[in-house]
């Protein structure tokens, strides 16, 4: 791989941005850039790649410069941005899917096809890096500018009939809960309550992460919420799941849960 000349890279990506409204031309020029900066040393390593997608092993600085050139264009031209994102997604490489996910995050939430695209792509994704990008970067403007619409989308993902989407829904909530500007936890509790009452073993890690983030945001509200979950269901799975998670939870919450679970056990005798 040639050493990265930032001046040259800026010229290459500026030229690439000129083809923003011509997906076929854009893809051709993007391939040339990715091939130019391909890290063949990493490609030839015998270790298994972390991605399940074909990849150029593009240096992060190259992808960030491409995103920098495209971000404002996507904001000003959302329809064309969505068309380009579709073409990039269909191209099927790790890098093209990551750029597509980035573009979704710059498209105004009012674009009517955005929510459908987010749902379709998150349902189909298998690569962990692309999945993470879709659940964070792609939801940036929706989460920040229209939190009510964002929560409607996540509630759809957490519908009882869409269990394959539950993990995505939980992970999508994390950045919102962690945001210092967000302090409205009751709607979050309402959305995740049915999932916690079910507590499937396959979601233990996701639920553990969720509880930690909720507790960091509001210890008292989260402790009370978990207490009501335990008191309000005859299903033993929430109690079983919380006992398994307890060693990984904050110490203060562990102490509270121990007492909550002891009281629940006493009531069932």
Language-model region placement:
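Alpha-helical scaffold domains
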Residues: 1-269
């Amino acid at each position: 791989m040639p050493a990265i000349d930032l001046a040259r890279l800026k010229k290459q990506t500026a030229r690439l941005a000129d083809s923003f409204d011509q997906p076929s031309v854009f893809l051709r020029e993007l391939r040339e850039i990715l091939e130019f900066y391909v890290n063949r040393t990493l490609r030839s390593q015998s270790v298994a790649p972390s991605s399940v997608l074909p990849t150029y092993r593009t240096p992060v600085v190259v992808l960030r410069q491409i995103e920098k050139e495209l971000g404002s264009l996507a904001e000003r031209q959302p329809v064309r941005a969505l068309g380009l994102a579709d073409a990039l997604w269909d191209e099927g490489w790790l890098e093209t899917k990551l750029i597509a996910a980035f573009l979704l995050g710059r498209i105004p939430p009012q674009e009517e096809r955005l929510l459908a695209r987010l749902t379709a792509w998150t349902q189909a994704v298998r690569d962990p890096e692309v999945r993470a990008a879709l659940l964070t970067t792609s939801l940036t403007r929706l989460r920040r500018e229209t939190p009510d619409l964002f929560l409607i989308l996540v509630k759809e993902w957490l519908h009882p009939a869409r269990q394959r989407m539950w993990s995505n829904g939980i992970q999508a909530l994390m950045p919102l809960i962690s945001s210092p500007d967000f302090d409205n936890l009751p709607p979050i509790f309402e959305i995740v309550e049915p999932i916690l009452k079910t507590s499937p073993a396959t979601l233990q890690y996701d639920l553990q992460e969720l509880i930690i983030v909720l507790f960091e945001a509001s210890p008292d509200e989260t402790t009370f919420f978990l207490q009501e979950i335990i008191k309000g269901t005859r299903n033993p799975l929430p109690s079983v799941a919380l006992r398994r998670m307890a060693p990984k939870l904050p110490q203060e919450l562990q102490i509270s849960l121990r007492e909550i679970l002891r009281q629940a056990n006493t009531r069932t005798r």
